[in-house]
């Protein structure tokens, strides 16, 4: 069970952004062992949980409040926005940000 007092971040468990996401977390000073097969990793030095999931699942996890933020590629974001528009939803509350 995830603790709601901790920040929950979803990243790809494998794929193009997996290693870049790990590197970003490390550069942010987040110490976490992501080299195991566990799907949930706890940061050692901050109240942060890292969830390793399929990239296509990350937008839904954010929208459903399972995680607080996630790292996805532009292709996944565009696909999710198109799906929400097709379903008649207003995708503006899905708030994309770019980190360079």
From Swiss-Prot:
Gene giving rise to this polypeptide: hisG
EC number: 2.4.2.17
Function: Catalyzes the condensation of ATP and 5-phosphoribose 1-diphosphate to form N'-(5'-phosphoribosyl)-ATP (PR-ATP). Has a crucial role in the pathway because the rate of histidine biosynthesis seems to be controlled primarily by regulation of HisG enzymatic activity.
Lineage: Bacteria, Pseudomonadati, Pseudomonadota, Gammaproteobacteria, Enterobacterales
GO molecular function: ATP binding; ATP phosphoribosyltransferase activity; metal ion binding
Stated family: Belongs to the ATP phosphoribosyltransferase family. Long subfamily.
Subcellular location field: Cytoplasm
Annotated keywords: Amino-acid biosynthesis, ATP-binding, Cytoplasm, Glycosyltransferase, Histidine biosynthesis, Magnesium, Metal-binding, Nucleotide-binding, Transferase
Protein name per Swiss-Prot or TrEMBL: ATP phosphoribosyltransferase
Catalytic activities: 1-(5-phospho-beta-D-ribosyl)-ATP + diphosphate = 5-phospho-alpha-D-ribose 1-diphosphate + ATP
